[in-house]
Amino acid sequence: MQQKIIKILTELRPEFDFSQSVDFIEEGMLDSFDVVMLVTTLDETFGISIDGVDILPENFSSVEKIETLLKKNGVK
């Protein structure tokens, strides 16, 4: 699943290396608009609906955090 997440992130912002272990929000790799686009893409790709209460910067700060959020929403 992590490779799929990295692919989605790279398509969204190709100028960054999302395989790094850094905070994507803190490092300026993702902004609020990017997070909205990412949520839409994740919803469509994985057939889920991420709840608005889960759209918090800390849930999108790393590949691992995004994976945890997806698992919370039933993605295996």
Identify what each model region corresponds to:
Residues 1-17, 68-76:
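Thiotemplate assembly-line natural product biosynthesis machinery
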Residues 52-75:
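C-terminal structural segments of small proteins and small subunits
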Residues 39:
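Aromatic/hydrophobic pocket-lining residues that form π-stacking "cages" and hydrophobic walls in ligand
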Residues 32:
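Catalytic nucleophile serine of serine hydrolases
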Residues 36:
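Conserved catalytic core of two-component sensor histidine kinases
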